[in-house]
Amino acid sequence: QVNLFDQTTPITVNNFLRYIDQDSYQDSTVHRSVPNFVLQGGGFKYEGTIPLDRIETFSSIQNEPVLSNVRGTIAMAKLSNSANSATSQWYFNLKDNSVSLDATNGGYTVFGQVTTEQGMAVIDKIAALERCGEVPVVNYTSSQCSDTSVDPDESNLVTVNNIVIIDADPTTAANLSPKSNTLIDNVPTPTPNPVPEPEKSSSGSLLTSLFLMVGIVGRRYRKKR
């Protein structure tokens, strides 16, 4: 389960919910995995061919870098050198990325956090999968990754089956203590490489394993509708 911080980052949460309401994330793929950094999705779908098809996006939103990019948080990916460019893509922080992401590019907006150890265990298992480039894959060899005559199919991808809001109560975040972003007013650090970039396309193979269908359950900390 993921708790969303509606009151702290209302613009971002409402944007995320808008994509959910439009079923934009249904059957989307986890298209980027960077060890000890981030696990990213929300940008592409597999429609029977490679490269993946981009999810249709709404207008970019205002950045809200109030909270810190610590392990277990979910944040919005965006274009490099463009603070207010987030649209549909999100990422989970696999470790404490506050130093590299809280002040860089205007700060990356954290808008929720994983609330259970079981939830993070699933994310860590996906992050530990083999990769083709930065795309996590299952039952797909390195030789297949480099063979341009062979493409992965749906069985080789990590798919987000659906995202469901299970609690819209505005008081659900009352007992949470998200870490504040105290670095945003500092001089920006050099952009880390790699950095979550929504425009970074993926080609090559993708993953799936026991986690072929990954359901993200959102609890509106709503601060939400």
Where are these regions (language model features)?
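Cross-family detector of peptidyl-prolyl cis-trans isomerase
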Residues: 1-202, 206-209, 218-223
